[in-house]
Amino acid sequence: MRRNIIISLALVLMASCQEFQPVFTGDYDDPAGYEKVELQPTHTIAQLADMYVNGKPWTIDEEIIIKGVVSTTDKPGNFYKSFYIQDETGGMEIKIGKNGLYNDYKPGQTVYIKCNGLTLGMYGFKSGNYGGNGMVQLGYSDPTGEYETSYIEVPLIIDTHIIRGEIGDELVPEVITEADLPGTNATLETCPYIGKLVTLKGLKYANETFTLLYLDSNKDKKASWNRIFLSDKTLGITTWAMSESKMKEYITSGIWDSCTVGSGSDNFGKVGSLKGDGSYPTIEKAAYSVSQYFKMGNKEIQIRTSGFSKFADTEIDPEVLAGNKTIDVTGILTLYQGSVQFILLDIDGVKVNE
């Protein structure tokens, strides 16, 4: 069946521009043992997040220490150069410019962060009728100005600011209901589940996907000329994401032959014509993030998965896709432009209800 896919600008504005990247998921040598460290936190995670002012990243110039427990791992490949910590008040992403963070920051491990000199910013805020809050992050200042925070790259800065403490039991996810989900302008003060490891039960497939393609992923990922969006109920994507090989499989199948780009970008209305070698003009065959949409009651949940994750090409149960079965999911609850997003740690975070 030939398909024309017209994507409204409103849908485009819901897309994330900070995309997943490849993650090393092999094994490193065991790290050196941890010294027992106990620092006195001055602020909770929510108190630190509350110090952020929209649109104004802050390079912290106060002696602030926060304490949290690591809730994520990048070993399955669905997190890139960052991990989340949480306390009783909420969770926060810590951006560190290195792969294989699971080797140093283990789920259940206590981490103290000396915030002076680091930068507090938000990813995913948008004003206006179709906007809302994003996620407050802790990282380093971005000299390019492209994002409010960048990665902490220098090993000395990492070691003197991110202090590893005791390794304890892994966190038990909190089971939350539709009523607990964050609203458009939610903060940790109004929704302490943001950034935390949680379980959502009884999600029903919403029969919609969202896929972002780049013409050149090495160039400006915010530029309209470099971004193509596919969002429709008939794209035929039945996996959680797409690896490079799966992406090529979809392209060569011809299922997207008549896709009309409608992203409000420089490519609006243009149709990619499949070439004899099984490629589209200018579109990369690389791994990208895919969002599969589910419903929790009346609330839409966007589950984002990296094409570099180990479970990217895992098929979603056909009975789930058909709407005959629901799923329970465990992962990190986030916001992007006021919309609820969800990031799985691994495929074990998906349970099909019989």
Where would I find each of the regions flagged by the language model?
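C-terminal motif of bacterial Sec signal peptides marking the signal peptidase cleavage site
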Residues: 13-16
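Sec-dependent N-terminal signal peptides
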Residues: 6-9
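OB-fold nucleic-acid-binding modules
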Residues: 18-80, 84-110, 114-354
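Positively charged n-region of N-terminal signal peptides that target proteins for export
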Residues: 1-4, 18-19
